[in-house]
Amino acid sequence: EPKHFAISLTGEPTLYPKLNELIKELHNRKYSTFVVSNGMEPGVLKNLEVPTQLYLSVDAPNKDLFEKIDRSVMKDGWDRLNESLKIINKLNDKTRTALRFTLIKGLNMQNPKEWAEKIDLAKPMFVEVKAYMHVGFSKQRLKMENMPTHSEVKEFSKEILKHSDYKIIDEHERSRVVLLMKEDFDGRVMTF
């Protein structure tokens, strides 16, 4: 029987009008909840029934790259994302929070200081720095060459950390992901 529910798979979960009720019901049944958002609905995040873990996906460190990569239909998408980062900061004492940086070789692996500024704004418990993977619909827009190697992800993570008080805590080479935290803690479980 499942114990953990990921609320993220297709589309943006914060657009689901009964998200709070879903999270409450899952918690009543003693399940953990894992919500992954693109940050375009900060008002929903602000009033969200607190999940067990809240992830915010970040694909760009600045407005120009955000507009190029995310191509949000919302004209104020960049502002919405930054507002959501501030909300993550306020939720840190209520739930596990994480930023997920997806690195795309040849596109957004630049401006490490600006990536660090996103960490500083949200101050999440975890930052996952991961490689773009050439799968699904993304294959229509990007190439196999846009997938950074694990060593490239790790090296770029180190560049980000020159501007941050976080540090590399863990990594998983096959998944091409590096975990950043301020400090590790007992009981942390590697889920990748």
Report residues per predicted region:
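Active-site beta-loop-alpha junctions enriched in small/polar residues
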Residues: 10-12, 38-40, 59-61, 102-104, ...
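Non-cysteine beta-strand/loop elements that form the S-adenosyl-L-methionine
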Residues: 46-65, 124-133
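Conserved non-cysteine loop/helix-boundary elements of the Radical SAM core domain that shape
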Residues: 9-22, 61, 65-86, 105-114, ...
